[in-house]
A protein has these predicted regions:
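Helix-breaking motifs and short loop linkers at transmembrane-helix boundaries and internal kinks
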Residues: 34, 66, 87-93, 232, ...
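Paired small-residue
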Residues: 6, 77-84, 92-101, 290-298
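Conserved MFS/SLC helix-loop-helix module at the cytosolic interface between two early adjacent transmembrane helices
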Residues: 53-92
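A late C-terminal transmembrane helix in Major Facilitator Superfamily
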Residues: 317-354
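Cytoplasmic helix-loop-helix junction between adjacent transmembrane helices
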Residues: 97-135
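C-terminal membrane-cytosol helix-exit motif in multi-pass small-molecule transporters
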Residues: 164-184, 372-376
Length: 382
């Protein structure tokens, strides 16, 4: 793969650490800023909101810029946001800094996906996107545990200082390595972009993304209590088991990209079907420790195997004007799916349903996503 692609991977790594490391620091943040854990947890929701809002807005505002300039500017925003997190004097300031940081997230991955596909031959486009997203999976496997450890040892602010340093390094390598001829989309104005987004085929792609990832996060949000209360693991075992999940993310991401290069429609349906099967098997399988560990890894693999295929699919449906915006909005759709899935899983639990049944209920999401995808494919053949 071309060297500039790994510059995008570095940016993805920094963004991934910044997004997820807060989950392991909520106790420390809450104690330092004088808020409850529940209130500190809203920093996660605030970030997701920033992604959903920032993806379309920043993509439209920077639509006429050369894509290299967009990527460098986004990493500057990301770095400034993390610096503001490290210096935040209050909870409100930290929330504002988290939202600022998140604004760059969706547009970086959206524009980065377009740039990545332009660096390789047509038959390797999905694999190129998968390589960029390897930064996100590496963040979960290596960056988040390391960032959590730094926060526990030296304070949560030290973690954000570290992520700021990663942002500076990513900005530099992107500025040096990404070619200057990474041009903006050929479009007249933002209205043309919006017409692309409103195409039925693009909207159905976005709905497929939302539904697929809602299934993942309806379960992953509650993976710790599933492992301890259903699987019978001690709390000390949760972190090592999550490393298995992270390994699954890496494997699934690369596999999904390679399969999508060979047969995109079959990969989309197949990965969503695999995700639904894993979720359904988790309900009986989590009652035995070996199968619980295996299924946790498979959840990561099946969930992230959908990412590159869904991203390249929306790019193919939005070919030409509006491609960057469609790609960025699809990243926002992943985050919307995360939020919907977490809400749905919590709703099931709140209604008194056994915790072990949540994965089975979550399987409804990828099953529905398959139906939407098949409808989209059928429309495309007409």
């Amino acid at each position: 793969m071309p060297l500039p692609l790994y510059a995008l991977t570095a940016g993805a790594f920094g963004i991934g650490v910044s997004e997820f490391v807060i989950m392991g620091l909520l106790l420390h943040v809450g104690a330092d800023l004088g808020v409850t854990i529940a209130t500190a947890g809203l920093l996660i929701s605030g970030y997701a909101l920033g992604v959903v809002l920032g993806a379309p807005i920043l993509t439209v505002l920077t639509g006429r810029w050369p894509r290299k300039r967009v990527l460098v500017a986004l990493m500057a925003v990301f770095t400034a946001g993390n610096l503001a997190c490290a210096l935040a004097p209050s909870y409100g300031a930290l929330m504002a800094a988290r939202i600022l940081t998140a604004l760059a997230h969706g547009t970086f991955f959206g524009v980065g996906s377009v740039v990545a596909t332009g660096l390789v031959p047509a038959e390797r486009k999905a694999s190129a996107i998968a390589v960029m997203f390897t930064g996100l999976t590496a963040a979960n496997v290596l960056g988040v545990p390391l960032g959590t450890w730094i926060g526990q040892q030296f304070g949560w602010r030290a973690t954000f200082w570290s992520v700021t340093a990663v942002g500076v390094m990513a900005l530099v390598v992107i500025a040096i390595l990404v070619p200057r001829d990474a041009r903006p989309s050929e479009h007249a104005e933002w209205r043309a972009d919006m017409r692309v987004i409103l195409r039925p085929a693009v909207l159905l792609c976005l709905l497929t993304t939302v539904l697929g990832y809602a299934g993942v996060f309806a379960v992953f949000t509650y993976i710790a209590p599933l492992l301890t209360h259903v699987g019978g693991f001690p709390e000390s075992a949760v972190s090592p088991i999550l490393l298995v999940f992270g390994g699954g993310l890496v494997a699934g991401n690369l596999l999904g990209g390679r399969l999508a290069d060979r047969n995109l429609p079959a990969t989309i349906v197949g990965t969503l079907a695999a995700l639904g099967l894993v979720l359904a098997l988790m309900t009986p399988g989590f009652h035995a420790r070996p199968s619980a560990i295996l299924l946790t890894g498979l959840l990561g693999a099946a969930g992230f195997a959908t990412v590159a295929p869904l991203q390249i699919w929306v790019l193919s449906k939005a070919a030409g004007a509006g491609q960057s915006l469609a790609s960025s909005v699809n990243i926002a759709a992943f985050n919307l799916g995360n939020a919907i899935g977490a809400w749905a899983g919590g709703t099931v639990i709140a209604h008194g349903v056994a915790l072990s049944v949540v994965p089975l209920a979550a399987a409804i999401f990828p099953a529905t996503a398959i139906l939407v995808a098949l409808l989209n494919m059928n429309i495309g053949r007409r």
